[in-house]
């Protein structure tokens, strides 16, 4: 980014650390260049990345997996509780939207507005989607048998193992702490297991995970790629 500002490069992406220096949001919530960038005759080009990031569950796991109502209630409670709107604001400078389906904007089949919401996690207030309240997730936890997040088998907080691929940087640590706080709303204790990508991928493929974070960037712009 600094080399770009010095004129060495014709084009550059904007890192999270430099975002506020280069971009601000106008009254309509659209990204525009800051006055300092405009004075340097820099132009802003934006595009929608055909990518999705998600939390996955091992469906063979005895706690979070399977098609029993108990496991389904637990998964839905977790999905309701993780506030991705907050995550996008804190860690992505507002660049992104909370996913309601596997198909991202810009790909045929994506639906915006009321028709595209995930009714398990969101409700429509007449103008926009609103994440269901924490009380709804807590009610599902109770139905699943984890009142206040307590595991009836141990009489202690339910422990969920969360596998991620990480290089161990400061940004990753902040994200992990944020995720712990999300599940703590339900009384769940999150055990984060961070590994290098190759090891992480092998663990997912061989079912050595319980809950994990992954993503997908389209190889080509067609919904069947998702």
Residue ranges and their predicted role:
Residues 5, 9, 24-27, 62, ...:
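Sec-exported extracytoplasmic/periplasmic mature domains
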